[in-house]
Amino acid sequence: MIPWNAYVRLLRLNKPIGILLLWYPTAWALWMANQGFPSIDLLMIFLLGTVFMRSAGCVINDIADRHIDRHVARTQFRPLTSGEVSLSEAFILLFILLCASLLLLLKLPINCFYFAVISVLITFVYPFCKRFLNAPQLILGLAFSMGIPMAFIASGKNLNSDFVVLFLINFTWIIAYDTMYAMTDKADDLKIGVKSTAIYFASYDRLIIALLLIFLHSLWLVWAINKNAEWFFYLLWCTAAGILTYQLKLIYARIPKNCFKAFLVSGYYGLVMWFAVGLALI
């Protein structure tokens, strides 16, 4: 009998927050590069690509961490660790996902291929970075930002000032929200020697997260002023600022379940800013 439920959990399809956090920056880029009106074809290619590559990343991560996950309370029952899915099954799923992603990539300009290769290489390397880099979130930031240049290139645009601002916003955002995520497992990670910015930042974790959020949210103002955005952009910008404030409140006591909740709330920030970008470009 095929363990469909275990496959769904291995690919994290039951927890779509990872897909959303990869999709929103790509959507921001598609809207920016197409003046608010990306084609249906591009949307479908990038949306499916997001799902396939995020799922592939989860499989790669679980293959690399299958011996570590059993020592972390939050991950000890993942399908590979628990034996519900075999290692060979995981590799077959990974192969299928990468092939599906390649088929989508063939529909995009050749220059997208170079960024896709970088993305795949980083995705394979990232799980191992947690073992020797104090700030593996920097690597994750690169991996989760590759959809941005690909969206601009696929839309026939140069990597212009909009791209630079958006790349900085997303890279900073990833470090901030993944540090919140890492705060959830900090106690277990310290025991088994897994590294993260939550550990590296030590007692300055909340302050650094706050500074990162202020920086990235301010960059949106730079973009909006340059685009002569109307008042509704700023209304949504203020709403998003409220979401960031709520996240900082959640992580204040460093309670693991609240830190994880703060991470999940990042999805609302991405959604609100997607609406803000879309309205600003109408």
From Swiss-Prot:
The record gives the membrane topology as: Multi-pass membrane protein
Record flagged with keyword Magnesium: yes
Mark the transmembrane ranges. 17-37, 40-60, 90-110, 113-133, 135-155, 163-183, 207-227, 231-251, 262-282
- What EC number(s) does its UniProt record assign? 2.5.1.39
Write out the pathway annotation from the protein's UniProt entry. Cofactor biosynthesis; ubiquinone biosynthesis
Please name the GO terms of the biological process aspect recorded for this protein, alphabetically.
ubiquinone biosynthetic process
Cofactors needed by this protein, per the record, are: Mg(2+)
| Organism domain of life | Bacteria
What PROSITE patterns does UniProt report for this protein, alphabetically?
A: UBIA
Q: Which CDD domains did the record assign?
A: PT_UbiA_COQ2
Q: Which UniProt keywords apply?
A: Cell inner membrane, Cell membrane, Magnesium, Membrane, Transferase, Transmembrane, Transmembrane helix, Ubiquinone biosynthesis
Which molecular function GO terms apply here? 4-hydroxybenzoate polyprenyltransferase activity
Q: Name one GO cellular component term.
A: plasma membrane
Q: Where in or outside the cell is it found?
A: Cell inner membrane
Q: InterPro entries, from UniProt?
A: HB_polyprenyltransferase-like, Prenyltransferase, UbiA_prenyltransferase, UbiA_prenylTrfase_CS, UbiA_sf
Q: Which reaction does it catalyse?
A: all-trans-octaprenyl diphosphate + 4-hydroxybenzoate = 4-hydroxy-3-(all-trans-octaprenyl)benzoate + diphosphate
The UniProt family comment states: Belongs to the UbiA prenyltransferase family.
HAMAP family the UniProt entry points to = UbiA (MF_01635)
The cross-references to NCBIfam families, in alphabetical order and at most eight, read: ubiA_proteo (TIGR01474)
Known role? Catalyzes the prenylation of para-hydroxybenzoate (PHB) with an all-trans polyprenyl group. Mediates the second step in the final reaction sequence of ubiquinone-8 (UQ-8) biosynthesis, which is the condensation of the polyisoprenoid side chain with PHB, generating the first membrane-bound Q intermediate 3-octaprenyl-4-hydroxybenzoate.
Q: What is this protein called?
A: 4-hydroxybenzoate octaprenyltransferase
